[in-house]
A protein has these predicted regions:
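ABC-family P-loop ATPase nucleotide-binding domain
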Residues: 1-30
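Short coil-to-beta microelement around the adenine-binding A-loop and adjacent beta1/P-loop entry
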Residues: 23, 36-37, 95
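ABC-type ATPase nucleotide-binding domains, specifically the catalytic core motifs of the NBD
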Residues: 34, 52, 90-91, 121-134
Length: 138
């Protein structure tokens, strides 16, 4: 990441941290696949440190919701704010925000010889040169 982008991220985070806003805010999120409405008006606030479970029957939109949070799926409508930044805005550099979020997919490919913690911290340590302690603290 270049210095200009890093500074922009630090400035956005500083504004968010002083605002008291949730870490993730989802507002009226919708995702349609033609006539199928996988998500319809989903709204939720997730604060830093919250543990959240997404539970529902097969086909209820759980994976679609998580894919939208990471913007691997483009929502049909609504907004997702991460640290106060609307990541559903096409002008937002989603790659800057993906550096601070991760996801283990339903059909995951973890390294079987490593613990879950080692699998989760591998990316931040290798891609961001983060220390083991810092990666685990995330």
């Amino acid at each position: 990441m270049n210095d200009k982008k890093r500074l922009q991220m630090e400035e956005m985070k500083a504004v968010w941290e002083t605002s008291g806003a949730p870490l993730i805010q989802v507002k009226d999120l919708e995702k349609h696949f033609d006539d199928l409405h996988a998500l319809n008006g989903v709204s939720v606030d997730i604060n830093k440190g919250d543990v959240v479970f997404v539970v529902g029957p097969s086909g209820s939109g759980k994976s679609t919701f998580l894919r939208c949070l990471n913007r691997l799926e483009e929502p049909t409508a609504g907004a997702i704010l991460f640290e106060g930044v609307n990541i559903t805005d096409r002008m937002t550099d989603i790659n800057l925000h993906r550096q601070k979020m991760g996801m283990v997919f339903q059909q995951f490919n973890l390294f079987p010889h490593m613990t879950i913690m080692k699998n989760l911290t591998l990316g931040p340590m290798k891609l961001q040169n983060m220390s083991k302690e810092a990666a685990e603290a995330q």
